[in-house]
Amino acid sequence: MYPRLKIYLKRIEENTRVIRQLCAGYGIRVMGVTKACCGAPELAEAYQAGGLAMIGDSRVANLKKMENIKAEKWLIRPPMLSEIEDLVRYADVSLQSEMETVRAINKECEKQRKRHKIILMMDLGDIREGYVDEEELIAAAVETEKLSHVDLYGIGTNLTCFSFIQADEEKMERLAEMRKKVENAAGHTLEIVSGGNSAALDLMMRGGICEGVDNFRLGESLLFGKERSRYTFLPGTRNDGFILECEVVEAKVKPSLPWGTAGVDSYGRKPVFTNRGEKRKKVICAIGRQDFDAETATPVDEGILILGASSDHLMLDVTDSVKEYKVGDIVELRLGYFSVLRAFTSPYVEKIFLKK
């Protein structure tokens, strides 16, 4: 049945091993993020096989899927108050920026007779989650340390996700300095200072991560073998862990340019087309924007050009391919991060996990 997404777990495992070893050389421990694959336990197992002991996701529902995975599990998005019961049940660690939530977690832990680890987040410019005021963060740390059923595990920051503010030496030094202030105020040595995501790898390799920052939350780099700051591939990794197969439903010769009065698309944009001639071999595949992101997909056949997609049609120019595509043929696409995220979320895409 098509479309279907093939996930090559051994390739992801090898990426994980290479990047874990790379980070270890700089004193950085890695937590593997599964959110692009909707918390698939198979992905968590590939991370574990690559040497990771910490697994994280942004949704409690995804952590629930990994209930039987023997790893330290993190919730990497501040939880809703309405899901605290399940958070305590399925997560060992969570990133927090509101003491009201931390208090609710402490109360629920008492009910469930469990303990939960808290990482307090500091906003260093991305204006997403975290404390901006240092004194507020310190006060939160002191209060957390006094609570009966939660542990002050560490502090962290998030960059390059909303405003796409980059990690730099100054921001990492400020985070490390905050570690000292929190430890002095709370009278407690922090086990974790989480300095960011795959976008921080470039800074790390340039020697820009100072002592005191010891953890990264990585997803994209493990899955696709590249850091997110400059989008360069890391040595020894590969980017073919996710191959989408889609079926051709129309194959015809058509002009490269549309004709008639042009309007805007469903996203408020006016499409732009390049004149490649009056006779181009084009195919339509039965998949669209509801199922994947055409902008972060690359045809395996280098002779294919992605023209664009509507909600459930993918238009391709196959004129330069050595293969003569016809109805019923299969086109393979190598997927990037957002394309994988959308494909995993779509119920119309079959997922096939391959242990190779």
Task: Briefly describe each language-model feature range.
Residues 20-24, 113-114:
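Glycine-rich phosphate/diphosphate-binding loops that line cofactor/substrate pockets in enzymes
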Residues 1-7, 11:
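Generic N-terminal amphipathic, Lys/Arg-enriched alpha-helix
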Residues 6, 28-173, 177, 185:
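Active-site-proximal beta-alpha core segment in soluble small-molecule metabolic enzymes
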Residues 1-2, 139-142, 146, 229-239:
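Short aromatic-glycine motifs in intrinsically disordered, low-complexity regions
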Residues 173-356:
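Active-site anion/phosphate-binding pocket segments in diverse small-molecule metabolic enzymes
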Residues 16-18, 25, 36-49, 62-63, ...:
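N-terminal capping/small domains of soluble enzymes
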Residues 12-15, 19, 178:
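Alpha-helical packing segments of well-folded alpha/beta enzyme cores
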